[in-house]
């Protein structure tokens, strides 16, 4: 009986010891794990979806960067029509896209004919709370106690994903992008014809800074995008996309401290650009142009594209 209990104890301790060794490695090797070369291994396959960008031969390309608010908020077809072919607008935004993924996509594209980049800023994208929408490699950035909470709140598979990422196993939830060489009808923009189902909560609940905090990595890679533009002689402008009035009221009432903290994080990372406000958000009676508090509908996309083109001309 004693031998059985002894063997059982040894057998039980083996997974626990393995768990402890892996977590100690993640904690002590954090800096090495998040070197640019390491992150590039996780995100290098994302640019395949944008190989069509290199086939556009135009001396003045303008890249639109950001998440879903930019993907659905601006029509490149309308912008190119307004520009009368003097500029070629191209939308590289995607649902929940962050600065890290954006940076590695940009690094793999031909930037020689890009004259300007405009990046929409959604502050909640810069939180660790949003890691649930990211490649599993970013789960290595969560301290152990936050990883435990995340596992309970969002994904019981967290630690399995975390250890797979540690050894660079593929992320089945974020497979390599399919090579795309055909130019999309709206140059990467998409019109939103139905109401999104995952944006019903107030904006003040999207951050969860007390539980997970900001992602310093996102701020670092935002600044890397700025530096890349400076290196290539490309003008860079950051701006806030338009919001519905209920969003604006909620943000002003409940997110003052969050916004102040966000701006402090930007400054800490070396980001000194002024983020331009959205002109459309200031116009009265425009709630009908939104599919929800964050995203413009098709009519809103066309309207905002005209405002945005005027903004580009003035800046």
What do these predicted regions represent?
Residues 6-27:
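Hydrophobic membrane-insertion alpha-helices, especially the h-region
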Residues 26-47:
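Alpha-helical transmembrane signal-anchor/signal-peptide segments
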Residues 58, 63-150:
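Membrane-embedded segments
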Residues 121, 130-232:
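Secreted/periplasmic serine-hydrolase-like ester/acetyl group-modifying domain
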Residues 191, 226-251:
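Active-site segments of SGNH/GDSL-like serine hydrolases
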Residues 244-278:
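Substrate-gating cap/lid alpha-helix
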Residues 290-315:
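Histidine-centered active-site loop/cap adjacent to the catalytic His
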């Amino acid at each position: 009986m004693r031998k059985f209990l002894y063997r059982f104890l040894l057998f039980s301790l083996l997974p626990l010891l393995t768990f402890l060794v892996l977590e100690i490695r993640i904690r002590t090797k954090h800096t090495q794990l998040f070197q640019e070369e390491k992150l590039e291994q996780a995100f290098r396959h994302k640019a395949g979806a944008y190989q069509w960008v290199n086939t556009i031969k135009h001396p003045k390309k303008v890249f639109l960067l950001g998440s879903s608010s930019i993907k659905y908020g601006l029509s490149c077809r309308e912008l190119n029509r307004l520009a009368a072919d003097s500029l070629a607008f191209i939308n590289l935004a995607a649902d929940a896209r962050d600065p890290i993924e954006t940076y590695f996509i940009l690094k793999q594209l031909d930037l020689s004919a890009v004259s300007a980049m405009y990046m929409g800023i959604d502050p909640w994208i810069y939180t660790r709370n949003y890691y649930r929408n990211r490649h599993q490699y970013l789960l290595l950035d969560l301290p152990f106690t936050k990883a435990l909470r995340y596992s309970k709140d969002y994904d019981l598979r967290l630690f399995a994903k975390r250890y797979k990422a540690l050894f660079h196993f593929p992320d089945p939830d974020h497979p390599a992008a399919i090579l795309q060489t055909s130019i999309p009808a709206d140059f990467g923009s998409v019109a939103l014809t139905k109401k999104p189902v995952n944006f019903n909560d107030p904006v003040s609940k999207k951050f969860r800074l007390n539980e997970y905090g900001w992602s310093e990595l996102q701020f670092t890679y935002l600044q890397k995008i700025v530096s890349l533009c400076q290196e290539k002689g490309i003008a860079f402008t950051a701006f806030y996309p338009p919001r519905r009035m209920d969003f604006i009221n909620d943000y002003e009432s409940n997110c003052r401290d969050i916004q102040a903290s966000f701006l402090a994080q930007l400054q800490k990372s070396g980001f000194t650009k002024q983020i331009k406000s959205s002109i459309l958000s200031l116009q009265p009676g425009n709630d009908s142009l939104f599919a929800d508090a964050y995203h413009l509908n098709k009519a809103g996309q066309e309207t905002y594209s005209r405002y945005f083109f005027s903004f580009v001309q003035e800046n």
